[in-house]
């Protein structure tokens, strides 16, 4: 049985270890780091992803420090989560702990996990600790950044409300994204989440010269692999990175231990923060934010914390808040985050999605019924929301046009039951006009994507916000009532719809 520490010993343990050699021309803080670095401990207990390590007196690593050990020839990183007393720490493993044994040596790096950052990460896939996993050689960058950072201070944040123009009509008109905002992307399987994400990456690179970072958190490895190859096929990235690559990928997929899944979103965010601090407008994608919470809950139980509601970790709101508050606009640049959100059992009151909702500025809802009509992007114009759709932010004209478009679509939705039972002939003249306009609006909300050119054969279109407003304003005011519905399907600006109508008329003649 371990002997209880005397008050004298306890006081000694609290003191930082005295450096073995006097560090010449170094500050006191730097000396402390040097003293802590290289401290060697030994594994005392392994429970799944949680590993306990004992250190010599006075050499205890700080909370969140990265420890390293060799696991059958592989570098295994452990992150300090708790100080247990008796000079022991409890750590979370970032990879599988199979093969670890008690008594094994563990070295303190003296700093949190740091990952490569900068342009060299574009086109590459990294894991949670910044190692390349795309079999394209080492990452050629010396710049590294710790994954645990404080949120920007109030004085460094930009308070101006600006919209990020994506070039996608339905998003820019009805649920615009805030620069430095957070967007929730809701949608089932096969409705076009990945294609929409890739188009956003492409358009932000073209329109703003900005980069994107994609964090795959606890999703299927197959999907991550597909996304990587689709990005290469559509020209968003090049294999092995290099000139022309627009996105960095960071993966911690379903097969990874909970430690990796709980930290991989922070690794991706750190890469995005570096681009922001270099003056870029960055898009940061997280697929799926629910898995970040789920991994935190697994780790929490292993650390011996008492669970809160529905078995989630007691620190749920804190974990989410610490990450989300780092996603913001500063005076240098912005990080706009698009987060895919899985809702367990479609229960929106579940603590995990409910905690995410509190941080969102906009929601983009993809609908299967719209996808079934062949309208892509399959964004639901009545279900998607944004707090940026405010006359004070987007202007009076944009706001009025958006509300009229939604009003027309809502009226069409209300009339659909009558049309299904009695047919169009039973509607009043006014309702017939409203339905005809709504059907044209529905089709005009579709748009050919650059990244889908390979499949559709139609050249992609990036539509300026002014052209989007002008087109829909004309539609709701009845200026294009004489044009056929087909003219509005899969075009960019309203001028293209008019041209298409002329072509259709010529073909019919």
Swiss-Prot record:
Q: Which molecular function terms from Gene Ontology are attached?
A: ATP binding; ATP hydrolysis activity; proton-transporting ATP synthase activity, rotational mechanism
Which controlled-vocabulary keywords does the entry list? ATP synthesis, ATP-binding, Cell inner membrane, Cell membrane, CF(1), Hydrogen ion transport, Ion transport, Membrane, Nucleotide-binding, Translocase, Transport
Any single Gene Ontology cellular-component annotation: proton-transporting ATP synthase complex
- Which Pfam families does this UniProt record tie to the protein? ATP-synt_ab, ATP-synt_ab_N, ATP-synt_VA_C
Report the superkingdom from the record: Bacteria
As for membrane topology, the entry says: Peripheral membrane protein
Chief location category: membrane
InterPro entries per UniProt = AAA+_ATPase, ATP-synt_VA_C, ATP_synth_F1_bsu, ATPase_a/bsu_AS, ATPase_alpha/beta_chains, ATPase_F1/V1/A1_a/bsu_N, ATPase_F1/V1/A1_a/bsu_N_sf, ATPase_F1/V1/A1_a/bsu_nucl-bd
Q: Name the segments for region: Disordered.
A: 1-28
Q: Which reaction does it catalyse?
A: ATP + H2O + 4 H(+)(in) = ADP + phosphate + 5 H(+)(out)
Where found? Cell inner membrane
Q: Which PROSITE patterns match?
A: ATPASE_ALPHA_BETA
Amino acids binding ATP: 187-194
Q: What is its EC number?
A: 7.1.2.2
**Function description:** Produces ATP from ADP in the presence of a proton gradient across the membrane. The catalytic sites are hosted primarily by the beta subunits.
User: Partners and quaternary state?
Assistant: F-type ATPases have 2 components, CF(1) - the catalytic core - and CF(0) - the membrane proton channel. CF(1) has five subunits: alpha(3), beta(3), gamma(1), delta(1), epsilon(1). CF(0) has three main subunits: a(1), b(2) and c(9-12). The alpha and beta chains form an alternating ring which encloses part of the gamma chain. CF(1) is attached to CF(0) by a central stalk formed by the gamma and epsilon chains, while a peripheral stalk is formed by the delta and b chains.
Question: Which protein family is named in the record?
Answer: Belongs to the ATPase alpha/beta chains family.
Task: Name the HAMAP family for this protein.
Answer: ATP_synth_beta_bact (MF_01347)
Q: By what name is this protein known? A: ATP synthase subunit beta
- What is the organism field in this record? Sinorhizobium medicae (strain WSM419) (Ensifer medicae)
Q: What is the lineage of its organism?
A: Bacteria, Pseudomonadati, Pseudomonadota, Alphaproteobacteria, Hyphomicrobiales
Provide the gene name from the record.
Answer: atpD
